[in-house]
Amino acid sequence: MNIGAITDKGLVRKTNQDAIFSKVSPDNKIGLFVIADGMGGHYMGDLASNKIIQEFEQWWLRFEVAEFNKTDSECMDELKEVLNEANSYIYINYSRDKAISGSTIAVLLIYDKKYYMFNVGDTRIYMIDKNGVNLITVDHTLRTELENKTGVTETDIRNNPKRDALTKAVGTKSDISWHETEGMVEGKRFCICTDGIYKFVDDELLKKILVSHSSPQKICDKLVQLVLKAGAYDNYSMYYICPENKKQDGRTSAFCCIALLLIAIILFIIFR
């Protein structure tokens, strides 16, 4: 797999309440990618996001000990249970009086030829393929709820000061539900990012960069440049994943073609 990654506190926040985690199996067939965004300004937001990541790290260690001998459905069942356990721990241990601690989460599991994902909150996963860029997560925000209500206009939503408030997060309630989907990996790339990325970049420009043929890390770096230019007053985190490990840089492909051509010419001269 070819992967780009970045996380930072931004230009204004004193701490980074985002937490990220990724691991790939030795045979390059299984990859787990997780981003958690602690609820900004809330009590113990950084502890919530870090606790989530710790739980998924522990799961991967157990997976390694088992020599990756689990089916994809077994992995997903266990990962969802990990999320349930993290939710219970945060709700019981990090909530004090009326203070609420919580975090968003987006999880992507690449398992051989298939992908699986689930999310809570507004951390997003974009899927990139020959048809363009598609959002495969659901934002659990007031905006989303209002958009699904009849009679509510875009102006109404834009004028609502709480439009970006989360309606779901890990650790804010005793139980938790999530959005999930799955599909085939072939021909697809993925971008996981917090709102510190996508809220600071024009949507059309974001999509243009995501479909570009730059390397995964260059794509991350390009988006971060735009975030910094826009002020970066939130933490930001991102993964860009090419599961099929195909180089996205056209110049690299051209170089390989030229190199092969030169080798062929040399062999022809030697053995003619």
Language model: regions and residue ranges:
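PP2C/PPM-type serine/threonine phosphatase catalytic domain
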Residues: 1-272
